[in-house]
């Protein structure tokens, strides 16, 4: 299994979060069907996800750099 920052596939940005550590939003996003992770929490103001399948993309995406062209 992989781990990494969840990434928004349309923008290339990380999922932002402000409540560090245990974070319901990150945990929910991580476990969502399209991500398939086992546990998510907030690390350095972005959602970090563990237990991801190899098919799930994580930040940074090769062709998108979040707002920078």
Curated annotation (Swiss-Prot):
Transmembrane segments: none
Disulphides: 13-66, 17-42, 26-47, 30-49
Residue ranges of every copy of the LCN-type CS-alpha/beta domain listed in the record: 2-67
Cysteine amide modifications at: 66
Cross-referenced Pfam families: Toxin_3
GO molecular function annotation: sodium channel inhibitor activity; toxin activity
Propiece residue ranges: 67-69
Domain of life: Eukaryota
Protein's GO biological process: defense response
Tissue note: Expressed by the venom gland.
Similarity section: Belongs to the long (4 C-C) scorpion toxin superfamily. Sodium channel inhibitor family. Beta subfamily.
Role summary: Beta toxins bind voltage-independently at site-4 of sodium channels (Nav) and shift the voltage of activation toward more negative potentials thereby affecting sodium channel activation and promoting spontaneous and repetitive firing.
Entry note about domains: Has the structural arrangement of an alpha-helix connected to antiparallel beta-sheets by disulfide bonds (CS-alpha/beta).
Name of the molecule in the record: Neurotoxin Cex6
